[in-house]
């Protein structure tokens, strides 16, 4: 079994950078759907997204963003923000989300795009300026959506899907599908997931297959 991350999984395939295709895998379930947010350091000069955008437009290319690598979900989020708001920035890719957000907290960059679970253990060290969703997040009711501010008005984030190799027998897929559903309905699991900032979102095998197709 393994995880795939949408939309990165499909983006890598569509750009010809993968040695596999969508048909190389058999979907089991979707585990988590995470919403992207715009982050700055807690003591940043930017208190609103409008502050950040104004600075970026007044100082083309000077604003720096840490990302988790080219074409990764957080890099896509930063690109979407810059495109929809109409500014230039300098992208600094790191080896992963942990390093990306460490750079933000150490003041090496001005902003980042990440998911809530990515910074759940150090929320006091960052400020959330906006969320990529049609509605405000329950955990951040005072933080506006991008659409409210006149920018990108759709959901953006990551869906974490569990898959098996193509050709895995249907009874095996069904076994794991049922097992993960049972796990994700467990009260202790749900409590732990909430504490970690995870947005659990179980989808069965058929619905996960449809989700993967939708993101192509």
Place the predicted regions along the sequence by residue.
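A ligand-binding cleft/hinge motif common to bilobed small-molecule-binding domains
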Residues: 6-17, 75, 79-84, 106, ...
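C-terminal capping/gating helix-and-loop segments adjacent to ligand/active sites or protein-protein/ligand interfaces
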Residues: 189-202
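Periplasmic-binding protein-like
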Residues: 1-4
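Hinge/capping helix and adjacent helix->loop/strand transition within the periplasmic-binding protein
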Residues: 7, 12-99, 146, 157-192
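Extracellular/periplasmic bilobal clamshell ligand-binding domains
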Residues: 204-216
């Amino acid at each position: 079994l393994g995880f795939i991350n949408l939309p990165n999984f499909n983006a890598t395939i569509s750009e010809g950078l993968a040695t596999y295709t969508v048909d190389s895998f058999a979907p089991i379930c979707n585990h988590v759907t995470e919403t992207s947010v715009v982050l700055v350091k807690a003591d940043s000069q930017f208190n609103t997204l409008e502050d950040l955008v104004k600075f970026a437009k007044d100082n083309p290319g000077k604003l720096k963003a840490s990302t988790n690598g080219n074409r990764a979900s957080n890099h896509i989020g930063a690109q979407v923000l810059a495109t929809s708001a109409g500014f230039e920035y300098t992208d600094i890719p790191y080896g992963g989300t942990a390093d990306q957000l460490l750079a933000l907290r150490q003041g090496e960059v001005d902003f980042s795009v990440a998911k809530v679970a990515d910074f759940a253990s150090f929320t006091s060290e960052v400020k959330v300026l906006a969320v990529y969703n049609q509605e405000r997040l329950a955990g951040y009711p005072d933080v506006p959506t991008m659409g409210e501010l006149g920018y990108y008005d759709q959901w953006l984030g990551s869906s974490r899907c569990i898959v098996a190799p193509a050709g895995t027998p249907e009874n095996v897929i069904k076994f794991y599908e049922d097992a993960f559903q049972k796990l994700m309905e467990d009260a202790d699991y749900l409590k732990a997931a909430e504490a970690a900032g995870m947005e659990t979102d179980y989808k069965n095998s058929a619905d996960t297959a449809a989700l993967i197709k939708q993101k192509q």
